[in-house]
Every structure is written in C-alpha cells, then in structure tokens.
Amino acid sequence: MSEVQQLYLDDLHVGQRFTSGSYLMEAARIKEFAAEFDPQPFHLDEAAAEASVFRGLAASGWHTAAVAMRLLVAGGLPFANGIIGFGGEIAWPKPTRPGDTLQVESEIIEITPSRSKPQQGIVTVRSTMFNQDREAVYLLTAKLLVLRRPRGK
C-alpha cells in the first residue's frame, strides 16, 4: 500500500483535482446512524420511508456528510495539517440509498495566502460526492485552513 502524499499550501494550485476512494452505503448502517443521530421514520423504517417524499429508505444527510468527510480524510484531500474547516455551504441534491457506492471528487477553486499569518492560507474547495450512477448526492464548498511547508521540508 502506498503512502498518501501530504500536501501544503505551496503544493496547491487553482484547478487541482482530487478523487477519494469509495464507500458502500448499507441499509443497516443507514438505520444505525439514524437511530443515534437523526431518528426520523424515513431513515429508520422501509415502510415509512416508502410513504415519505423519499419513496424509499434514504440516509440522513448528516450521515452522507460524515461519509464524505471520511473519504476526504482517507486521502481525498491529502493536506498535511488535516482538513480544518472555516465554513462552507452544503447541499444534498439527491438522497443516498442503500447499495450506493459513493466517491468524492474535489477541486481547488481559490487560494488566499494569509497576510497576517504567513505560515498559512485559506483554500476554497468544491467537493461533489457521486453515487455509482454518477448522480451527485452531496455538494460541499468549503473554506479550509492549509499550512505552508515548514522550512527544511
């Protein structure tokens, strides 16, 4: 297994793209997450979900967001200092379903070096999580803190 390259602000450029590994969303995991964090009937029960606006079991949007974060941390955004957010916008254009295989694609859309803290900058990243049919199920535009490469590295 190869080690993921750890990137600093100095390594990044606008238009740079990253692709994560994949994750299989299972019905049992949807229900487990929902039972603890988003206990609404359409996330917990197939019959209730079928009668809902979703017309079938759907993962919580927060579960979908958590999976996206896992994929980004596991190599989808290999920033040396981790993924440290300053804010952003989220959308869920389609529900995530049991059996979906999810993958995140990200693009750097802006880099702003800090004037007051020259050792860091803010990087704006647009990430889209797709299912196996290339349907977008999660959109995130985030402002992230990224450090410059330390001297000698």
Residue ranges: model-predicted function:
Residues 1-14, 92-153:
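HotDog/MaoC-like acyl-thioester-processing domains
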Residues 2-87, 149-153:
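Hot-dog-fold acyl-thioester-processing enzymes
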